[in-house]
Amino acid sequence: MAGEGINEDYPVEIHEYLSTFENSIGAVDEMLKTMMSVSRNELLQKLDPLEQAKVDLVSAYTLNSMFWVYLATQGVNPKEHPVKQELERIRVYMNRVKEITDKKKAGKLDRGAASRFVKNALWEPKPKNASKVANKGKSKN
């Protein structure tokens, strides 16, 4: 398929899909070469624990996804293979990491600052003279 004419072994209708698939495989191959050019220990030493978990999860998900594709190309239904449960398990952990990341990004309430803000924004003390004047006016009636 590397630039030759259309092969007679498969229908013409799927030629574009096969070309796209071949390009995707090439892109994945390049990404894997880049990722594997640095030792795992070197990579993980530069990252905090949360980032390490993300790298491990993405690696596991990628590997299992590639195995899913391999099974499909071999005529095995990957939905009935244990790889499906493994992918679901990895997704659960990915969601947990996402929740942790979201919690870190979420704003935190400073109760003291909030109370001062509300007090200063809403509360206005009555002038002492105004209350005496009001009382005198009521007592004269």
From Swiss-Prot:
Pfam families: Sas10_Utp3. It is found in: Nucleus; Cytoplasm; Nucleus, Nucleolus. Residues 100-141 are annotated as: Interaction with NCOR1 and NCOR2. Residues 1-100 are annotated as: Required for transcriptional repression. There is a cross-link at K119, K126, K132 (Glycyl lysine isopeptide (Lys-Gly) (interchain with G-Cter in SUMO2)). InterPro entries: Exosome-assoc_fac/DNA_repair, Sas10/Utp3/C1D. GO terms for cellular component: cytoplasm; exosome (RNase complex); nucleolus. GO terms for molecular function: DNA binding; RNA binding. PANTHER family: NUCLEAR NUCLEIC ACID-BINDING PROTEIN C1D, SUN-COR STEROID HORMONE RECEPTOR CO-REPRESSOR. The lineage of its organism: Eukaryota, Metazoa, Chordata, Craniata, Vertebrata. Residues 50-100 are annotated as: Interaction with NR1D1. This is Nuclear nucleic acid-binding protein C1D. The keyword Metal-binding does not apply. It comes from Bos taurus (Bovine). Monomer and homodimer. Interacts with NR1D1, THRA, THRB, NCOR1 and NCOR2. Associates with the RNA exosome complex. Interacts with EXOSC10; the interaction probably mediates the association with the nuclear form of the RNA exosome. The homodimeric form interacts with TSNAX following gamma-radiation. Interacts with RAC3.
